[in-house]
């Protein structure tokens, strides 16, 4: 088996009133938040799917199904810590992560360092092992119409 494995992940959630907006474990000031069974942190969800995909372990819905009441309102960083442990238990470590968050509003650049630091702490990585970029969809599609926010992630795993 190869010493390296890669995986990619994607997530999207609808923006709604009355919910907090949490990205990368950081709560952002915004009039709308992401709707979902857990805290709906699309960045953290995309990262979890990339990590699980790298080892052909399925997706986050398999481990944390939205039909299970125990995950209602769950903190995605706690779920991420469980995924990280699952990977470590199988003899792998994270080489690096890279991600893109697509949102028209709010502007994310001022929050990227805090997101990276929060994720690095949970994953026991150095912040420079985590890339987070933000872009818009130039007013195109559901994210462009500000109906939701999505995130893409890729993970490189290295055999211990």
UniProtKB/Swiss-Prot annotation:
Site entry: Transition state stabilizer: 37, 136
Listed pathway(s): Isoprenoid biosynthesis; isopentenyl diphosphate biosynthesis via DXP pathway; isopentenyl diphosphate from 1-deoxy-D-xylulose 5-phosphate: step 4/6
Record keywords, A-Z: Isoprene biosynthesis, Lyase, Metal-binding
Matches recorded under Gene3D superfamilies: 2-C-methyl-D-erythritol 2,4-cyclodiphosphate synthase
Entries under PROSITE patterns matching the protein: ISPF
UniProt-listed InterPro entries: MECDP_synthase (IPR003526), MECDP_synthase_CS (IPR020555), MECDP_synthase_sf (IPR036571)
Entry binding sites for a divalent metal cation: 11, 13, 45
Free-text comment on the cofactor: Binds 1 divalent metal cation per subunit.
Residues that, per the record, bind 4-CDP-2-C-methyl-D-erythritol 2-phosphate: 11-13, 37-38, 59-61, 135-138, 145
Biological-process GO terms, alphabetical: isopentenyl diphosphate biosynthetic process, methylerythritol 4-phosphate pathway; terpenoid biosynthetic process
Molecular function per GO: 2-C-methyl-D-erythritol 2,4-cyclodiphosphate synthase activity; metal ion binding
Broad enzyme group: lyase
EC number, as in UniProt: 4.6.1.12
CDD domains: MECDP_synthase
Cofactor needs: a divalent metal cation
The reaction(s) this protein catalyses: 4-CDP-2-C-methyl-D-erythritol 2-phosphate = 2-C-methyl-D-erythritol 2,4-cyclic diphosphate + CMP
Pfam families, per database record: YgbB (PF02542)
Membership in a protein family: Belongs to the IspF family.
Function according to Swiss-Prot or TrEMBL: Involved in the biosynthesis of isopentenyl diphosphate (IPP) and dimethylallyl diphosphate (DMAPP), two major building blocks of isoprenoid compounds. Catalyzes the conversion of 4-diphosphocytidyl-2-C-methyl-D-erythritol 2-phosphate (CDP-ME2P) to 2-C-methyl-D-erythritol 2,4-cyclodiphosphate (ME-CPP) with a corresponding release of cytidine 5-monophosphate (CMP).
PANTHER family documented for this protein: 2-C-METHYL-D-ERYTHRITOL 2,4-CYCLODIPHOSPHATE SYNTHASE, CHLOROPLASTIC
Subunit structure: Homotrimer.
Designated name of the protein: 2-C-methyl-D-erythritol 2,4-cyclodiphosphate synthase
Name of the coding gene: ispF
């Amino acid at each position: 088996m190869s010493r390296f494995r890669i995986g990619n992940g994607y997530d999207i959630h609808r923006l709604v009133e009355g919910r907090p907006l949490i990205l990368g474990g950081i709560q952002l000031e915004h009039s709308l938040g992401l709707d979902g069974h857990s805290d709906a942190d699309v960045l953290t969800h995309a990262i979890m799917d990339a990590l699980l995909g790298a080892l052909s372990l399925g997706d986050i819905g398999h481990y944390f199904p939205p039909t299970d009441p125990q995950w209602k309102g769950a903190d995605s960083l706690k779920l991420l810590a469980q995924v990280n442990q699952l990977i470590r238990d199988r003899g792998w470590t994270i080489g690096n992560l890279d991600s893109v968050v697509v949102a028209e509003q709010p502007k994310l650049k001022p929050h990227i360092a805090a997101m990276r630091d929060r994720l690095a702490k949970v994953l026991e990585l150095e912040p420079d092992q985590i890339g987070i970029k933000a872009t818009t969809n130039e007013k195109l599609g559901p994210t462009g119409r500000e109906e939701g926010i999505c995130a893409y992630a890729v993970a490189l795993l290295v055999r211990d």
